[in-house]
């Protein structure tokens, strides 16, 4: 029988929560396969069927999620996210295509600077998303990181993981900005995540000066694990290895915001990709449970 969304984890008291959930059902920044606007609804609905435990049987009931509902108008995303950040919780955003990260990362930058922190982006994706224009727009999902840099993020505090699909303008930009760390999927599939974690830990572990925004595009996973996405790229990342990488980030780094983007239920097969996103969230909740004790 269908239960309430997120079962026992949901609370109507935002002060009681340790996690705030925001849906952004927007996909007008998408260049090809659409449908990501349906992901927040689909993932919430699937959560009704998922007991509050990790894959290892660890209870998640120490977490309380406050659902801030959806904001679907692009022009209203900034104001809505400003409201949420004032509560000083962990923030989980369900997109939407990757263009939704442009306004949320802008607000996060302003938030971090008010706290005298240096804002950091860890970008897990098949694509660098560092085009200046794409399809005639500066607000395409292919332009997310370029807009972040324009808004004030330092290039040496952006790390890209899982990349394997480049536009020519992105290759040119990155060749001129070697301080921006890029880890291709081919490197990871050969060498694993060890050196990436070492680099990130050296820069940000135990740091009181940084605050991290983790942006997870589901197309970082190989399409065999995540077929329901608008711009699938072959030769991607293994879902277990990527999950373990994300878990290590949450265990060791000061992550304040995570978005999960580019899940497209209409392009999916038996909700495989939506389930992957949801199960990833639950594994992260297992780590947040320990931090919330």
Predicted region positions:
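Conserved alpha-helical scaffold segments that buttress catalytic/binding sites
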Residues: 2-293
């Amino acid at each position: 029988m269908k239960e309430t969304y997120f079962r026992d984890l949901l609370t109507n008291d935002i002060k009681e929560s340790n996690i705030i959930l925001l849906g952004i059902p927007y996909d007008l920044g998408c260049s090809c396969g659409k449908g990501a606007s349906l992901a927040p609804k689909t993932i919430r609905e699937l959560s009704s069927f998922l007991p509050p435990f990790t894959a290892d049987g660890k209870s998640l009931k120490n977490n309380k999620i406050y659902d801030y509902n959806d904001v679907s108008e692009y022009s209203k995303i900034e104001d809505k996210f400003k409201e949420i950040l004032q509560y000083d919780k962990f923030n989980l955003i369900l997109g939407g295509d990757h263009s939704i990260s442009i306004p949320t990362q802008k607000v996060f930058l302003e938030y971090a600077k008010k706290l005298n922190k240096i804002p950091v982006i860890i970008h897990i994706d098949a694509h660098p998303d560092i085009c200046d224009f794409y399809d005639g727009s500066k607000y395409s999902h292919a332009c997310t990181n370029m807009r972040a840099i324009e808004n004030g993020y330092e290039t040496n505090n952006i790390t890209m993981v899982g990349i394997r699909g480049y536009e020519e303008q992105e290759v040119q930009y990155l060749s001129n900005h070697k301080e921006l760390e890029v880890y291709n999927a081919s490197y990871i599939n050969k060498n694993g995540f060890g050196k990436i974690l070492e680099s990130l830990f050296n820069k940000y572990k135990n740091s009181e000066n940084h605050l991290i925004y983790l942006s997870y595009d589901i197309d970082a996973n190989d399409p065999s694990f995540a077929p329901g996405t608008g711009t699938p790229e072959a030769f991607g990342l293994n879902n277990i290895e990527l999950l373990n990488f994300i878990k290590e980030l949450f265990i060791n780094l000061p992550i304040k915001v995570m978005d999960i983007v580019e899940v497209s239920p209409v392009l999916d097969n038996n909700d495989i990709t939506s389930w992957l996103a949801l199960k990833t969230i639950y594994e992260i909740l297992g780590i947040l449970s320990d931090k919330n004790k």
